[in-house]
Amino acid sequence: MRSELSVTSSIFEANRARGAVRFDVHARDGVTRRGVLHESGSLRVRFPSPEDEGLSGVFVNTAGGVAGGDRFDVEISAADAARLTLTTAAAEKVYRAPGPAAELNIALKVGAGAHLSWLPQETILFDRARVHRRFDIALDEAASLLLCEIVVFGRTAMGERMEQGEFVDRWRLSRGGRLVFAETVRLGGDIGAKLARSAVAKGGAAIGTALIVPGDEALIERIREASESFAGEVGISAWNGFAMARFCAQDAARLRADMMAVLARTGAALPRLWLN
């Protein structure tokens, strides 16, 4: 006979969400067009009317959020000279996970002369959520990239904070076939206490990263001109043709405002959904 634990595990697995999106875009006569699109499970991507800047895509999670044991995979390729902007229809909520962690895997490839803007709305981690996220990014030497992520530890708009849980965020970026950036953030256990440390978040509940390629000292100076308007902590550095901005704030609203101020200095066009 199957044990009660085995039956419970089987039911849990059967109720986990799965979703995958895979597509490529290419440019012809200055117009970016989508190639073959593969969608499965509860993850979808929709393409509003074409814009002068290129093609825009909006991810929709029909599962209504992410729970423990869920898995979502995204694989996107922008061929030479293509221009693509991606965002999400809403903030992604990651719920409490009594079992395995949720997995989010994103693979991005950008060709020569192509540009990709990855600008999802914030990811909100509920108390005791567990999620492992992985970015694998491959850039041509002549490609450009704007990759922004905001993570909020708790529903700050409701006065809630994430106290316990697990968040693992792994970024790997190669350029011209060489690994040029690798970082893994691991927060687990008593996350609330760790975020309270001065060397971590100084009590902030929202963190963000903006990776800009190419980026240089001139870009840093333009961003510093906006520093007096920042509501939270913002730091930026540049090296080897990259620029990276780090953000920390008390809540999602303040952090988003700071990130928008930084992006305005880069000349980036924000998705309309960010402005609603």
From Swiss-Prot:
The keyword Cytoplasm applies. The keyword Cytoplasm applies. It is found in: Cytoplasm. GO terms for molecular function: nickel cation binding. GO terms for cellular component: cytoplasm. Pfam families: UreD. Disulfide bonds: none annotated. Keywords: Chaperone, Cytoplasm, Nickel insertion. Belongs to the UreD family. PANTHER family: UREASE ACCESSORY PROTEIN D. UreD, UreF and UreG form a complex that acts as a GTP-hydrolysis-dependent molecular chaperone, activating the urease apoprotein by helping to assemble the nickel containing metallocenter of UreC. The UreE protein probably delivers the nickel. Required for maturation of urease via the functional incorporation of the urease nickel metallocenter. This is Urease accessory protein UreD. It comes from Bradyrhizobium diazoefficiens (strain JCM 10833 / BCRC 13528 / IAM 13628 / NBRC 14792 / USDA 110). The gene is ureD.
